[in-house]
Structures are given as structure tokens and as C-alpha cells.
Amino acid sequence: MFLFDWFYGILASLGLWQKEAKILFLGLDNAGKTTLLHMLKDERLVQHQPTQHPTSEELSIGKIKFKAFDLGGHQIARRVWKDYYAKVDAVVYLVDAYDKERFSESKKELDALLSDDALATVPFLILGNKIDNPYAASEDELRYHLGLTNFTTGKGKVTTAGGDSGVRPLEVFMCSIVRKMGYGEGFKWLSQYIN
């Protein structure tokens, strides 16, 4: 019973209670995708090898169904991202906010995702990770380098009128997965757009 209550608390706090969702975790290698997935699954922080093959985690408790796909971020793994776009409910795109030298590469991949017709109406949560590092980019700096200044939809509820408004929910949240900061707010925001 304790385990059920614990999982309920985690998912309810993320706004995913009584919802079913297929979520892709994307981003360059070393951005924190696998670490985030394991923190969401069992609040465990462990060292991970780079993800070589796509993995998925499915949590199902009561009426909660949450399926997350962790697709590797290295250049070869990015080639299979497109294979997972079908019937996806949301994309969580992670960026290493400390690795400023890779911002242009991350922007290129994000631009490709945002311009793909298969993802045209899919909400995007962009997480700037590793803000526990004092030299990590600020939210404004990350928005600028990703070309998202004045492009995001806001951290409040965006009215999408049943998906007909042409507005794709897209927002940036800064986080530190290892310190368990910021990503919860991002998932609460994202949950508004998962039916």
C-alpha cells in the first residue's frame, strides 16, 4: 500500500493522475534524459552509461498509465527518433544548460523536431538541466540560444481550442535533476495538455 501511495503522490504532483500518456524524452547525449526517467520512476540517482538503444518505462497503477521513451541522444541514436513520433502525446526535450558549446547543436535538433509535421500539435516541455552548476545558462540565455525568445506560449494555461487554434504549447523550465528541482513544475505545466 505504501508503494501505491508513493507512486500516486509522485504522479499526482506531476499532474499525471488518471491520465494516459506517451511521452518522448529527447535531447543530446549527456543532457539528463535517463537520469530524469529514473528519478520519475523510483527517485533514484545513479550513474548511467550513455543510452545506446531506445528504452521505455511503463508505470501502471490504478488508472495511471505513463509510458516514457528514452531515446539516446548521440548522433546515431537521433536517427531513430522519428520512428517514435506516432501517437505521441508530448515531448520532453532536455538541454544541458552548462554545456554552452553544444547549444547550436541542440537548437538544430530542436528546430528539426518543431518543424516536423508529425509533431505539429504535440506539446513540448523544454528542460534546461544542470542549473545546480553555477556556470549554467540562465533561462533567458537558454531561450536566446535555442531561438525561443518570444516564441514560447507561457507558463500559464494556453487555450488550444481542441487543438484547432494552431498554437502548440511550448515552454522552457530550468531544472536540476540531481537536486530534484524545477522539473516538477514543468511536468505540471505539461499535464494540462495531455488528454
UniProtKB/Swiss-Prot annotation:
Enzyme class: hydrolase
InterPro entries, per the entry: P-loop_NTPase, Small_GTP-bd, Small_GTPase_ARF/SAR, Small_GTPase_SAR1
GO molecular function: GTP binding; GTPase activity; metal ion binding
Main location: endoplasmic reticulum
Tissue: Expressed in most tissues.
Description of activity control: Small GTPases activation is mediated by guanine exchange factors (GEF), while inactivation through hydrolysis of the bound GTP is stimulated by GTPase activating proteins (GAP).
Database matches in PROSITE patterns: SAR1
Compartments in which it is found: Endoplasmic reticulum membrane; Golgi apparatus, Golgi stack membrane
Listed GO biological process terms: endoplasmic reticulum to Golgi vesicle-mediated transport; intracellular protein transport; membrane organization; regulation of COPII vesicle coating; vesicle organization
Role noted for this protein: Small GTPase that cycles between an active GTP-bound and an inactive GDP-bound state and mainly functions in vesicle-mediated endoplasmic reticulum (ER) to Golgi transport. The active GTP-bound form inserts into the endoplasmic reticulum membrane where it recruits the remainder of the coat protein complex II/COPII. The coat protein complex II assembling and polymerizing on endoplasmic reticulum membrane is responsible for both the sorting of cargos and the deformation and budding of membranes into vesicles destined to the Golgi.
PANTHER family: RE74312P
Subunit structure: Homodimer; upon association with membrane. Part of the coat protein complex II/COPII, composed of SEC23/24 and SEC13/31 heterodimers, that it helps recruit and assemble on endoplasmic reticulum (ER) membranes at ER exit site.
Protein name: Small COPII coat GTPase SAR1B
Organism encoding this protein: Brassica campestris (Field mustard)
Name of the coding gene: SAR1B
